[in-house]
Structures are given as C-alpha cells and as structure tokens.
Amino acid sequence: MYKNLIKILIVTLFTLIPNLSIASAEISKIINNYNINVIFLRHAIAPGYGDPNNFKLGDCNTQRNLNFEGIEQAKMIGNYFRINKIKFSEILSSEWCRCLDTISNMDIGKWKEFEGLNSFFQNYSDKSLVTKLLYKKLNTIKDEELILMVTHQVVIAQITGISPSSGGMVLYSTLNGKSKNIVINYK
C-alpha cells in the first residue's frame, strides 16, 4: 500500500514540477515523450569560478579548464550517450576551451564551434549577440532533429531557467519551450 502511495506521489510531483531532476533517467523515453530536440550540456568539471582577468578566446592558458576529474566525466558522458544509442543530428560547442575539451573527450562524433553558446558571465562575450544567435539557431531546428549544445550554466539558464551542475544536462523542446533537468549517474 505504501509503495503505491509513494509511486503516486512521485508521479504527481513529476507532473506538477516540470523541471524536476531525474536520477538515472531513461533519457530516450523522455526525449520521445516530451518532443525534445535539444540537449543542453554544461561543460564537464572545471574547478574555480569564472575565468581569469587575462582571458583570451582561443588561448586555453588564459581560461578555466577541465581538470582530470572533468576529463574523466566528459568520457563517461560520451559513454553514456553511446550505451543509450543517442545519436545527434548536429553537435555544437561554445568556443571556450572547457566546452571544446568536454566535447572532444566525449568522442561522439563531429562537432562545430558556435558563438551562440559562448559564456557572457563576465562580459567576455556580448550577451545580446550570444542570445540572438542562439535563439536564431533554436528557431531553425526541425522537430525530428536532436541537437547537442555544449555550453555554460548562464547560457542554459537564459534559455531554460535551469542552472545545471558541471556535466549536467537540460533537455529542451523548441516546439513548446519546455525543459527537463536530468541528473545522470554516468558511472
């Protein structure tokens, strides 16, 4: 009896709270059930906060970068997508080194840098330009596509209202603007 009550409460909470985190979710079912066509992925673990004052785009020595744990996390994320047979129509990444290193270490296919995913947290990129480019891209995504976007917490929050942790995913539908924060144990 209590097990059924708990199940009902969980289902009710999931229905009432659209951005509820889901541990070890069956991502393919969620993608299909919620018409998801974008997966926003926050870069893997890069210790620290923001970027150094001498930040220069394209120069990883002037940026906050992945540590060993972040590199391993990126590899596990890539393995997760492969194991779950999740294929992407397109893979895009912020031009920041920690995002490029995340997607490189995931090793899931060809990808392109996209200015519309760059961080505007410390004004190293123009927020209005980044947002304009990203919305323009989102408006061109077809219903049947699935696009992976490797980016930053501020960019994901700007679009979805959700702030994922490093290596966290937010599933997003351009059809209805709904999003789901997904917490996965990649191990």
Task: Enumerate the predicted regions with their spans.
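Short, surface-exposed amphipathic charged segments that create phosphate/polyanion-binding patches used
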Residues: 125-132
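Generic beta-sheet signal
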Residues: 36-39, 145-151
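Sec/Tat signal peptide C-region and signal peptidase I cleavage site
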Residues: 19-24
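Bacterial N-terminal signal peptides that target proteins for export
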Residues: 1-9
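A short, structured loop/turn motif at beta-sheet edges
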Residues: 139-145, 174
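Short, well-ordered beta-to-alpha junction loops that form the rim of enzyme active sites
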Residues: 93-96, 150-154
